[in-house]
Amino acid sequence: MDKLLERFLHYVSLDTQSKSGVRQVPSTEGQWKLLRLLKQQLEEMGLVNITLSEKGTLMATLPANVEGDIPAIGFISHVDTSPDFSGKNVNPQIVENYRGGDIALGIGDEVLSPVMFPVLHQLLGQTLITTDGKTLLGADDKAGVAEIMTALAVLKGNPIPHGEINVAFTPDEEVGKGAKHFDVEAFGAQWAYTVDGGGVGELEFENFNAASVNIKIVGNNVHPGTAKGVMVNALSLAARIHAEVPADEAPETTEGYEGFYHLASMKGTVDRAEMHYIIRDFDRKQFEARKRKMMEIAKKVGKGLHPDCYIELVIEDSYYNMREKVVEHPHILDIAQQAMRDCHITPEMKPIRGGTDGVQLSFMGLPCPNLFTGGYNYHGKHEFVTLEGMEKAVQVIVRIAELTAKRGQ
């Protein structure tokens, strides 16, 4: 455990923000730097079958140290950080023995406050690693990367019985491309866990069904002084569309298993406008109903427009709820829960209000629930992680390996 914090601080010092709208994978050069560093560290650690694909997927194997019919398992984390907030020149602050109250982030006015983030009340006495208020931290998911690397070191350096352990580090998870080029067969695991969750105890195997909705609105612009009966204002049509979307079914008004419509961007002029929504729901039937609702709204608002003016709507499914794949293999969750209990952690089964690489991988034939990292408030300047939470994650990874070995002996 002595190198856990050192690894994490080294990894977050590298700018690995991914970039949307880029065809190449990985989308940024910084991700290659971390992947090459990890490859070197895996080689120094003595792992085998180390490969780094042209699409930036790094894989390696820790061979079994016991005999028996033990299934090969895997652990996966992503190296990129979110493009939503700066990940350049990350300057972490280490707050030892947190005593409560506000934590100043850097020298400005930014604070990490328990008023806004009540979870801090539960973390008294712990060591918190925060930002300086100018960048995100990168615990999502460099905490997971550091935890997997540290768990490998623990397994490698101690006589803990384990079967074959396969690890992978992926790029571009934050822009939805992380698992697209993942070779499940080459990975060689019967099942895996992404280490990409939040607070201690979280175990996630349910996620949103997700779709994107792109709306193009073509209007007609003329001089406002002579516009009566002629002008068709694309921006006004966009406003009418959004007014029809249920206001109480937005991200800021929903939680738990509740789905939502989210207007992610809107731009335009009188002549032309574009809107981008994302749709999310855990229930497949409700998910399909939300898509139909968007089509009905577009049809309603577009009714009776001049032939040269129109509303075009394109819906694309992004991913589905991995629950249907994971529940076919209940032992995967049983082992993870038992590992947590053995480490004096109460498992907290909760839905992912988002997605992970494990979602796509589960539908590619690799069941892959998500383990906690000990991090909070991802994708922004209030992101932080606890050292104790990271240590617990390492313990759980090691215990999962040990329990899987016992299962096969």
Swiss-Prot record:
SUPFAM superfamilies: Bacterial exopeptidase dimerisation domain, Zn-dependent exopeptidases. Keywords: Aminopeptidase, Cytoplasm, Hydrolase, Metal-binding, Metalloprotease, Protease, Zinc. Pfam families: M20_dimer (PF07687), Peptidase_M20 (PF01546). The active site is at 80, 173 (proton acceptor). It catalyses: Release of the N-terminal residue from a tripeptide. Cleaves the N-terminal amino acid of tripeptides. Belongs to the peptidase M20B family. This is Peptidase T.
